[in-house]
């Protein structure tokens, strides 16, 4: 039995399988997940697990090179954006229109669906390398 880090087997596996520039999406409970993209559904009820809790644990396990948010988060969910940006600890951060964000999610290795029930609480995390 694994005793540290992410215990969810599919999520732990996806992170372990990432190569440089592969990416995953951490999503609120409303983001559409494209057909053919692996869905790791963590949602138990609205708000559980929270986007920020999930992001914190993923960042502890994953080597992140950069992140992308939808432009709309700045206006509609600045508290989540600020907290998530702080967690990313100086990593380059980009913003794209929400429609483009949804298009980008089609190329994700997986979309991790949280129970977050607040607008635009979604981020794309690009894998870096550990050397």
Swiss-Prot record:
Pathway field of the UniProt record reads: Carbohydrate metabolism; D-ribose degradation; D-ribose 5-phosphate from beta-D-ribopyranose: step 1/2
Q: Which residue ranges traverse the bilayer?
A: none
Query: What Pfam families does UniProt report for this protein, alphabetically?
Result: RbsD_FucU
**Matching Gene3D superfamilies:** RbsD-like domain
Catalytic residues at: 20 (proton donor)
The Enzyme Commission number assigned here is 5.4.99.62
User: Does the record bear Isomerase in its keywords?
Assistant: yes
Molecular function terms from GO:
D-ribose pyranase activity; intramolecular lyase activity; monosaccharide binding
Catalysed reaction(s)?
beta-D-ribopyranose = beta-D-ribofuranose
**Compartment(s) of residence:** Cytoplasm
First-tier enzyme category under EC: isomerase
Top-level taxon of the source organism: Bacteria
Q: Answer yes or no on keyword Cytoplasm.
A: yes
Keyword annotations of the record: Carbohydrate metabolism, Cytoplasm, Isomerase
Residues engaged in binding substrate: 28, 98, 120-122
According to its record, what are the GO cellular component terms? cytosol
**GO biological-process terms attached to the record:** D-ribose catabolic process
What function does the entry list? Catalyzes the interconversion of beta-pyran and beta-furan forms of D-ribose.
| Family per record | Belongs to the RbsD / FucU family. RbsD subfamily.
> Could you give the subunit structure recorded for this chain?
Homodecamer.
Query: What name appears for this protein in its UniProt entry?
Result: D-ribose pyranase
- Record organism: Laribacter hongkongensis (strain HLHK9)
Q: Which gene encodes it?
A: rbsD
């Amino acid at each position: 039995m694994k005793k540290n880090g992410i215990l969810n087997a599919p999520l732990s596996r996806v992170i372990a399988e990432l190569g440089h520039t592969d990416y995953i999406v951490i999503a609120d409970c409303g983001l559409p997940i494209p057909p053919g993209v692996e869905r790791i559904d963590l949602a138990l009820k609205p708000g559980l697990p929270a986007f920020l809790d999930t992001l914190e644990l993923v960042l502890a396990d994953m080597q992140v090179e950069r992140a992308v948010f939808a432009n709309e988060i700045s206006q509609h969910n600045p508290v989540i954006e600020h907290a998530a940006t702080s967690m990313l600890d100086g990593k380059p951060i980009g913003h794209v229109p929400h429609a483009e964000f949804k298009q980008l999610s089609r190329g994700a290795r997986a979309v991790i669906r949280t129970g977050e029930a607040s607008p635009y609480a979604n981020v794309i995390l690009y894998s870096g390398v550990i050397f």
